[in-house]
Amino acid sequence: MQQSFYDAIGGAETFKAIVSRFYAQVPEDEILRELYPADDLAGAEERLRMFLEQYWGGPRTYSSQRGHPRLRMRHAPFRITAIERDAWLRCMHTAVASIDSHTLDNEHRRELLDYLEMAAHSLVNSAS
């Protein structure tokens, strides 16, 4: 049986590190901090971690707690332009870069970043 992406990169520990590093940047980012209520950063962090773990072959906790991901629907209330997308991607690239190459080799790193780029582009819902 082929190993899942989730298991290949270290499972929950790796996703927790990526998401934690991402959310550590949010309060300091002038664009992103407007999108995330300060009183729910921990909740947002948990939801993103659970989503990514499930997407990449880990536990299905996200769906069991929140239902189908429906990313576009869940992000529709937020005005997301290329500016917000690029800020999100900048912080996510920094978070992914913080994971050592032994844990996240080049092939898996590229696959993860390609997905994150695609997802971020698909969530843009406003031209300006």
From Swiss-Prot:
One of its GO terms (molecular function) is heme binding. There is a cross-link at Y23-Y36 (Isodityrosine (Tyr-Tyr)). The modification 3',4'-dihydroxyphenylalanine is found at Y36. Contains L-DOPA (3',4'-dihydroxyphenylalanine). Heme binds at H75. InterPro entries: GlbO/GLB3-like, Globin-like_sf, Globin/Proto, Globin_bac-like_CS, Hemoglobin_trunc. Binds 1 heme group per subunit. PANTHER family: TWO-ON-TWO HEMOGLOBIN-3. Homododecamer. This is Group 2 truncated hemoglobin GlbO. It comes from Mycobacterium leprae (strain TN). The lineage of its organism: Bacteria, Bacillati, Actinomycetota, Actinomycetes, Mycobacteriales. The gene is glbO.
